[in-house]
Swiss-Prot record:
Keyword Ligase annotated: no
Reaction(s) this enzyme catalyzes, per UniProt: phosphate(out) + ATP + H2O = ADP + 2 phosphate(in) + H(+)
PROSITE patterns recorded: ABC_TRANSPORTER_1 (PS00211), ABC_TRANSPORTER_2 (PS50893), PSTB (PS51238)
Domain ABC transporter, chain residue ranges per copy: 6-247
EC number(s) given by UniProt: 7.3.2.1
Entry-linked InterPro entries: AAA+_ATPase, ABC_transporter-like_ATP-bd, ABC_transporter-like_CS, P-loop_NTPase, PstB-like
Organism in which the protein naturally occurs: Methanosphaera stadtmanae (strain ATCC 43021 / DSM 3091 / JCM 11832 / MCB-3)
Name this protein carries in UniProt: Phosphate import ATP-binding protein PstB
Gene Ontology biological process terms from the UniProt entry: phosphate ion transmembrane transport
One MF annotation (Gene Ontology) recorded for this entry: ATP binding
Amino acid sequence: MSNKVIEVKNLNTYFDDHNVLKNINTDIEKNSVTALIGPSGCGKSTFLRTLNRMNDLIPIFRKEGQILLDGKDIYDNNVDVVELRKKVGMVFQKANPFPKSIYDNVAYGLRIHGEKDEDKIEKIVKKSLKAAALWDEVEDKLDKSALGLSGGQQQRLCIARTIAVSPEIILMDEPCSALDPISTIKVEDLINQLKKDYTIVIVTHNMQQATRVSKYTSFFLNGEIIETGNTDDIFLNPKNKQTENYITGRFG
């Protein structure tokens, strides 16, 4: 992988004494989509949350090893975690719009990070909603509550809110699991558009989704990466028997 933006070296994570991730070594390529697959409880969401230090919010969490973003360890003591999470945004499994207007949902992060120029905020809100393929559906109701949007629209709003603060990387934790098939297609189309400008790491239980949106896939099992590589190779010609068993439905 020639153009890596994230390097993970000898990563072990623990909740109390429970070793959740075991000796993870992997890279994430810039401006690509990497899918994380594996059965429930295999560690893929825990891994995703190490990439912007969301696990730090859990008191019993600790880690060993390094995660380098653009060559710098994100767990160094001098790292500003707020700035890190601006650079590495997160879209959660369940859409979580704020109980505010559609406009204020997207503007919120900009204001939190100190932007006071309302003309600039307005331009970024519009640009972000367009990038999230939502503008045409909401342009005449920006002052309405975001809670009135459909589930699929709310998830795209959360994506717009994430990209408004200009992240380098977008993490997605099963972003389509609560959506109907039509909304899922819209989010997948959006992912394929966003990868031109962002690096995306997506956790999914939907293996067909992994084949549709990702360039690379990592298969997790019992806290380890069993196999990682080009998505076509993983699904069409897996090197590991455990990978083959999982993607053919023999377990998981």
